[in-house]
């Protein structure tokens, strides 16, 4: 096990970068950096103990797991193992009881892309001690030769059940018109070992190419009455559905927003960028309790921007789409993720930001956390990266970042590139 400490806190000067967003007094902490062996770390995920913000657990590609006992100031790194294999798409979520779950893709033969069994199921592993140790894991969606991909999960309010949703590919990457993708969901008790038979959620199927016309981006959330809600992207639309019986059955899909240009977006220095939706619910006792939020990126204004819509009636009707980034036109913001503070009800969105550049082609990239205390009506954009980075566009950079927040303790997590080497970082953002 490897321990990495926070770098010395830097005093952030009010320089020209303040002109494009509020400069948060944050310290950046590195969780990991590629050591030259195996896969480079990316696609980070992070979760905070709901009753003890000092305990934070994170993960990254391919099988990295990190834990902190001081609110993210220092981290211990380990490798996650499972008899079912560990092959990326890390999803770390916390239970109201303080358990943590790490969901990921499977590699039961340990041969990676050389194995026909790769991606044959979604795997869930549980930790009851803050990420120090993990269960062997339980699988869901095992229907070979179909491939299971792009999963995310949420735990219900009393911690008794975990729900997961993902995309099933008839054959990943296939261009055959008869091959399709669907959104599936399953659930298990708190142990996360035995999962229910998957239920199809998406009424309309997508193709298997893994692009705009593929059904992807299912991030479930739990409503205040225990309903399960989820949105995903397919073609130029964001679809929404919900279950009111604990995930056993689902309703008719609703189109709730357009995702102009599709979810498969292109950014200089990165290549393909995922603009898929993220779904959250305000479960606090604040004025917007029960509000469902959906967050995504698209190119409706020509450049890539971060967007949000919300519903106060269980998904029946949706608000006018609002832009989260507060800059002018013709600069890109991308790789968005959202969380809602379960204590305060504040909405926090993390994304990469290039508003400080002279031209849209410039690749210098900052990290911004946008926060709303009024239900998404207005936004404060804070630059949380101490310095920008400039990606070269030659590496697999991953498909997402992540963010967690409890009672004003906000921890974004992101990937950074320096001279062809990837590293994973967080920022210690503690709001009054």
Name each model-derived stretch.
Residues 8-21:
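Bacterial N-terminal signal peptides
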Residues 1-7:
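N-terminal secretory signal peptides that target proteins for export/translocation
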Residues 2, 17-19, 65:
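Intrinsic disorder/low-complexity segments
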Residues 25-432:
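Extracellular, repeat-based ectodomains that mediate carbohydrate processing or recognition
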Residues 5, 20-22, 40:
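Intrinsic low-complexity/disordered segments
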């Amino acid at each position: 096990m490897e321990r990495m400490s926070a770098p010395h806190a830097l005093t952030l000067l009010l320089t020209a970068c303040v002109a494009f967003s509020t400069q948060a007094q944050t310290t950046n902490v590195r969780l990991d950096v590629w050591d030259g062996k195996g896969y480079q770390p990316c696609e980070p995920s992070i979760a905070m103990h709901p009753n003890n913000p000092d305990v934070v657990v994170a993960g990254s590609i391919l099988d990295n797991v990190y834990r902190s006992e001081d609110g993210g100031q220092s981290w211990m790194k380990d490798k996650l193992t499972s008899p079912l294999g560990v092959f990326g798409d890390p999803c770390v979520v916390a239970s109201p009881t303080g358990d943590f779950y790490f969901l990921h893709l499977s590699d039961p033969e340990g041969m990676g892309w050389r194995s026909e069994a790769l991606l044959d199921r979604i795997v869930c592993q549980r930790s009851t001690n803050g990420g120090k140790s993990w269960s062997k894991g339980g699988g869901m969606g095992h229907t070979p030769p179909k491939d299971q991909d792009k999963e995310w999960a949420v735990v219900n309010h009393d911690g008794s059940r975990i729900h997961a949703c993902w995309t099933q590919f008839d054959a990943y990457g296939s261009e055959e018109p008869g091959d399709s993708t669907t959104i599936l969901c399953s659930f298990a008790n708190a142990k996360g070992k035995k999962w229910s038979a998957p239920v199809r959620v998406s009424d309309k199927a997508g193709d298997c190419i893994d692009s705009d016309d593929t059904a992807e981006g299912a991030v479930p959330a739990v409503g205040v009455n225990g309903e399960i809600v989820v949105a995903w992207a397919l073609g130029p639309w964001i679809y929404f559905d919900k279950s009111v019986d604990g995930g056993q059955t689902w309703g008719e899909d609703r189109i709730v927003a357009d995702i102009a240009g599709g979810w498969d977006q292109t950014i200089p220095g990165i290549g393909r960028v995922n603009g898929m939706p993220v779904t959250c619910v305000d479960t606090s006792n604040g004025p917007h309790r029960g509000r469902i939020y959906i967050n995504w990126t698209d190119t409706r204004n020509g450049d890539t921007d971060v967007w949000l819509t919300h519903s106060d009636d269980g998904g029946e009707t949706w608000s006018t789409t609002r832009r989260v980034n507060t800059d002018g036109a013709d600069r890109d913001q991308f790789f968005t993720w959202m969380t809602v503070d379960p204590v305060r009800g504040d909405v926090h969105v993390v994304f990469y930001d290039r508003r400080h550049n002279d031209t849209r082609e410039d690749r210098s990239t900052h990290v911004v956390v946008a926060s709303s205390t009024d239900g998404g009506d207005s936004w404060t954009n804070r630059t949380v990266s101490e310095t920008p980075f400039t990606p070269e566009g030659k590496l697999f950079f991953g498909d997402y970042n992540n963010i967690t927040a409890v009672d004003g303790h906000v921890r974004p997590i992101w990937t950074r590139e320096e001279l062809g080497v990837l590293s994973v970082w967080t920022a210690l953002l503690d709001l009054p």
